[in-house]
From Swiss-Prot:
The lineage of its organism: Bacteria, Bacillati, Bacillota, Bacilli, Lactobacillales. SMART domains: BRCT, HhH1, LIGANc. The active site is at residue 126. Zn(2+) binds at residues 415, 418, 433, 438. Keywords: DNA damage, DNA repair, DNA replication, Ligase, Magnesium, Manganese, Metal-binding, NAD, Zinc. This is DNA ligase. It comes from Leuconostoc citreum (strain KM20).
Length: 681
């Protein structure tokens, strides 16, 4: 849900400076999640709205524009550890966006005014994928790279060579760099997510994220299995293929054997552009691949040169972004769930509808204020959109369709899980259960503690946590480390192998660095980033527990609100006792990332899993050595695992690694690699 922006004319200089700084940070964080982690935090239209607001403010207050502002840099990912850097011979620019036909008309008028005449345009579908540059020398594919930050990308040559639609040899022995989009066809995306769910893995949010995550793999075998495809649409060296227009370039690309999208169209009027947009707005779901808009390009290449570009975008092209796709549905119920911090969140349960290629029947209503502001009632007909193919959201209530006897929805006053009275804390919009013994909160806290981004205890998901709670085998996070084999074997569907795997994952989690433990404790307002910043500063959990609000708030990126939350947490008797019990269990409470890591190490940046019994030392020692050399040691095998080190009696993890095509080493191979690294690194 977008905030109401203050009109620019009503802003003081100080207010503008503060809002610009906030927007720059927010958009940077969104960009990191989208480009680097392939896990977007918000829908595209929300990002676009914040970005447009930042552009407007920076235009009005140029003294606050900074070199690292998202408006001054090409969107893209930083280079992933383990992938070589590639310097682009010419910058890989982003496209400017417009979101209405009126804005597109304004762009056309500016372009016409600059050129002095009405230009011919080439229209292309905006493929929802990952930008890539392909370099051919004498007709042979020698390098492929991602956009990265626009100047430096990642070398993904080996991965791209597994994509069948990209030729390794052109039909002519020419030397050229071309650019295009790697995407995942809808059918491949559906198959991949079905398999991931069967394997107990989290499905990808959308085909774009799946394509990005698949291309940026260190394990080429994984990329090959993902069935990616590509379209080529640009070269910075048109003379190499003897063309003078964008449409001519597409024809030459096809003649060279390169994959091109054949839906492009050369037009001359805005009416033609409107018709093209209308045509593919209605047809987008029938295409075999995802599109999120239409790209309008000046067709004559010499006119493109005349128009030039800014530091970030070309002036000769613009992307029209499709509005969020909408569907009509009926709200049948409103359910309330309790989170780990006690926040009670409403969710609308609706008649299932097809939206952006998936079936949707639930949408978060966020908090009581949101629910009241929209006046959503059971039985209402509502519009539903899923912009960016990510988060379903109710748009508006169709009041004309509301049943005559439809009553205002009553906000609950008691917790749906423990039936304690709900409260509104000062300054919060959330409805909250403050009962520390609420079973729903305890379940969510334990599930969070074991989650991948916290202590990463593989095999301890919501179902297992629920079983353990019902059996009274665990009560808090410390009790996880007191679990016994006999207890686990008494649970439904637990066999000897699964028990061994879970106990092994619990043991492995003891060696995690402090920031994971701090995040796993589930302190209100302390996310993964804040946990890392605090851990870096104080080094030990006890030092954090002893710190004052002023000490913690002095950390860049940590405000007084977060600092107060941390101090209040560690003042409680329960937290003090928990620290003692975690220490007694042997859980590391020290920040481990002060080791100076050699970024040239083979292990740097790789996700590695250890399994089985090691003869030349313990798994804990091996884990510490790998972490000191920049590896991320995890407890479970997934498609993102780079290497499995298998000792004696390796079990299901080895089977899964082989099934996923993950590289597997025995202990001797690991020892030899350690020797090559040198003991002084």
């Amino acid at each position: 849900m977008l905030p109401e922006f203050t009109p620019v004319n009503n802003l003081t200089t100080q207010m503008a400076q503060q809002e610009i700084a906030t927007l720059q940070k927010r958009l940077t964080d969104y960009g990191v999640a989208y480009y680097e982690e392939d896990a977007p935090l918000v829908e595209d239209y929300i990002y676009d709205a914040f970005y447009a607001r930042l552009v407007l403010l920076e235009a009005q207050f140029p003294q606050f524009v900074t070199p690292d502002s998202p408006t001054q840099n090409v969107g893209g990912a930083k280079v992933k550890s383990g992938l070589a850097k590639v310097v682009h011979p010419a910058p890989m620019l982003s496209l400017g966006d417009v979101f209405s036909l009126e804005e597109l008309q304004e762009w056309d008028e500016r372009t016409t005014k600059t050129l002095g005449f009405q230009s011919e345009y080439n229209l292309e579908l905006k493929i929802d994928g990952l930008a890539v540059a392909l370099t051919y020398v004498d007709g042979k594919l020698v390098q492929a790279s991602t956009r990265g930050n626009g100047s430096i990308g990642e070398d993904v040559t080996a991965n791209v060579k597994t994509i069948r639609s990209i030729p390794q040899t052109l039909t002519e022995p020419i030397t050229i760099e071309v650019r295009g989009e790697i995407y995942m066809p809808k059918s491949s995306f559906a198959t991949l997510n079905k398999q991931r769910e069967a394997d107990g893995l989290e499905p990808f949010a959308n085909p774009r994220n799946a394509a990005a995550g698949s291309l940026r793999q260190l394990n080429v075998a994984i990329t090959k299995k993902r069935e990616l495809s590509a379209f080529v649409y640009y070269t910075a060296d048109p003379d190499a293929i003897g063309v003078t227009t964008q449409s001519g370039a597409l024809e030459r690309f096809a003649a060279l054997g390169l994959p091109t999208d054949d839906h492009n169209r050369v037009i001359a009027t805005m009416a033609d552009i409107d018709a093209y947009i209308a045509e593919y707005t209605s047809q987008r779901e029938r295409l075999a691949y995802g599109i999120d808009g239409v790209v309008v390009k000046v067709n004559q290449l010499d006119n493109q040169l005349d128009l030039g570009h800014t530091v970030k975008i070309p002036r000769w092209a613009i992307a029209y972004k499709f509005p969020p796709e909408e569907a009509l549905t009926v709200v049948r119920d409103i359910e309330w769930t309790v989170g780990r911090t006690g926040a009670v969140t409403p969710t609308a349960v609706m008649d299932p509808v097809q939206l952006a290629g998936t079936t949707v029947q639930r949408a978060s209503l966020h908090n009581p204020d949101y629910l009241n502001a929209k006046d959503i009632r059971i039985g209402d007909t509502v519009t539903l959109h899923k912009a960016g193919d990510i988060i379903p959201e109710i748009g508006q209530v169709l009041l004309a369709e509301r049943p005559a006897n439809n009553q205002v929805y009553d906000i609950p006053t008691f917790c749906p899980a423990c039936h304690s009275e709900l409260v509104h804390l000062d300054g919060e919009v959330a409805l909250r259960c403050i009962n520390p013994f609420c079973v729903a909160q305890i379940q969510e806290k334990l599930t969070h503690f074991a989650s991948r981004n916290a202590m990463n205890i593989d095999g301890m998901g919501p179902r297992v946590v629920s079983q353990l709670l019902k059996a009274n085998y665990i009560q808090d996070v410390a009790s996880i480390y007191r679990l016994q084999e006999t207890q686990l074997l008494s649970l439904d569907k637990f066999k000897e192998k699964s028990v061994t795997n879970l106990l092994s994952a619990i043991t492995t989690s003891k060696s995690n660095s402090l920031e994971r433990l701090l995040f796993g404790l589930g302190i209100r307002m302390v996310g993964a980033k804040a946990a890392r910043l605090i851990a870096e500063k104080f080094k030990t959990l006890q030092a954090i527990a002893d710190a004052s609000v002023i000490d913690i708030a002095s950390i860049a990126g940590i405000g007084e609100t977060i600092a107060l939350s941390v101090v209040q947490y560690f003042k409680t008797p329960e937290a003090k006792q928990l620290l003692i019990e975690l220490q007694e269990a042997g859980v590391n409470q020290t920040y481990l990332s002060d080791v100076i890591v050699d970024e040239t190490s083979f292990f740097y940046g790789k996700k590695i899993v250890l399994t089985g019994k090691l003869e030349k030392g313990s798994r804990t020692e091996a884990t510490k050595w790998l972490q000191d050399h920049g590896a991320q040691v995890t407890g479970s095998v997934s498609a993102k695992t780079d290497l499995l080190i298998a000792g004696e009696d390796a079990g299901s993890k080895l089977d899964k690694a082989n099934a996923l095509g993950v590289t597997v080493w025995d202990e001797q191979a690991f020892i030899e690699a350690q020797a090559k690294e040198g003991t002084d690194k």
